Every structure is written in C-alpha cells, then in structure tokens.
C-alpha cells in the first residue's frame, strides 16, 4: 500500500539524510582583560579584580536614609547593631563610588565581615568592644574619628539639621584608597575569595 505507517520500511521520508553535518563550535564571550570578581563571581576588569576589598559600616537608621554608594557594593550585609537597630556592612571591590555613607561605628562582630572578605575595615568611631576587636584581631582599619576632615567629611546639609550629626559622616572610594596607602595596608587582593 502507498500509505505506510511510521513503523513500516517505506517511511524513508523520516530517516536521517546521508550527509552528516559537523556541529558548529560554540564560541564563548571574549574574556580578554577580564577576571572573576572574587566577591560576586561575575567578570570585571582584570585590574579591578586585583583590588583588596573595603568593608564599610553604613548607617541603616530611618533618619540616615537615603544611604549613598550602596548600589556600588559587591556584597551588602544587614546586621543587628543594638536593640532593633541594624547597620549595613558594604563590601566594595570596585572603587568607583563618589560618596559612601553615612559611615557608622565599629562593633566587635562587625570586624568578622571585614576579615572574612580580606577587606580593610572602614568605620567612624566604635564601641569599646569594637575598638578592642580591631586591635586584638589586627584588623586593618580606617577610622573616621581619626580621619575626619581628610578621609571623611560631614555632609553640610545633614550636619546642621537637629538630630542628624551622627548620620552625617561620609567617605568615598577615592578617600578609602588614599587611606589604604596612608596606613601602608596591602592594596591588592589578599587571596580570600568567595569565587575563583
């Protein structure tokens, strides 16, 4: 019969053609000049990937809003500071943020976020146990209490508003790099990485 079933021998129209095509080799993206960001696993500029990260304590109180620079952070932790008040620990590998803050004080356990990411710890002041932890754990740090007016500045709009002084300390990526150089800290990646 001329109407064969799929399983019959005359279903030749369904058989594979005689000529075999070689599969085309897929080309991946051009990764020239790129390297893995050790914090995110995403590709970034090779030189940027070599930066040592900075861990900045940023105020998360409702009076501190809006914060500056957090969109440039590679990792953003929200951590309890006291009571129901939280702070952000922003980890930066890319030093392009022009304004970061408001920067707040060190707490004992905040130092672990810097150490775990091989980062320089950036804060403005600290609790007694925060300062003890920085010293006891040999945490490379830049403190706004020592560097106000040079590596840190007060936002003029906030500093003159009632109840806003503690929400007015800022720094920048450029100032953090200046501080790393000033204190003689290693500016290159310390080898602690989430991605490699």
Pin down the residues of each PLM region.
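A surface/extracellular/periplasmic glyco- and lipid-processing/surface-interacting theme
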Residues: 6-14, 25-77, 82-196
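Sec-dependent N-terminal signal peptides of Gram-positive bacterial secreted proteins and lipoproteins
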Residues: 1-4
